[in-house]
Swiss-Prot record:
Pathway: Pyrimidine metabolism; dUMP biosynthesis; dUMP from dCTP (dUTP route): step 2/2. It comes from Pseudomonas putida (strain ATCC 47054 / DSM 6125 / CFBP 8728 / NCIMB 11950 / KT2440). This enzyme is involved in nucleotide metabolism: it produces dUMP, the immediate precursor of thymidine nucleotides and it decreases the intracellular concentration of dUTP so that uracil cannot be incorporated into DNA. Transmembrane segments: none annotated. GO terms for molecular function: dUTP diphosphatase activity; magnesium ion binding. This is Deoxyuridine 5'-triphosphate nucleotidohydrolase. The lineage of its organism: Bacteria, Pseudomonadati, Pseudomonadota, Gammaproteobacteria, Pseudomonadales. Its EC number is 3.6.1.23.
Amino acid sequence: MHALQAKILDPRLGSEFPLPAYATPGSAGLDLRALLKEDTILEPGQTVLIPTGLSIYIGDPGLAAVILPRSGLGHKHGIVLGNLVGLIDSDYQGELMVSCWNRGNTPFTIAVGERIAQLVLVPVVQAHFEIVEAFDESQRGAGGFGHSGSH
C-alpha cells in the first residue's frame, strides 16, 4: 500500500467522522465526506462546492488522484460531480473540495459527514510532443466518433 501525506483541516475528521478509508479490501476508492457546517439542500440544477476537511500531498509525479462520484448518489438521487471528474495533481497541497451537482428533479439534502465522493490514486505518464509530417498508418486512421462500429 502506498503512503499518502494528509493534513486534517477540520478537527471533526478523525473524531466525529472517520478518516477516508477503503470500504472493503477490494475497494479502489477512499470515501470522502461532506465536512459542512450544516446540512445543505441542493436544489435541482444547483451546484455547490463541498469541503472535505482534508488536504493531501501526493508528491510523486508518477501518480495523481481523481475524485469520482459515488455510484449510488448518481443513480438513486441524480447527484453527480459538477466537473464530472476532479483531477488532483501530484504537487497540489490544498483542501480537497467536491463539486456536487443535482441533475435530478427534486431537492436533495447533503448531510454533514455524508460520504459524497471517492478518491482514487492513478498512475501518470507524462509525454512530450514529437512533431512529425505524417503518422504511421493504422487500421482506424482518422475515423472519429462512432467510427469503430455501433453497439
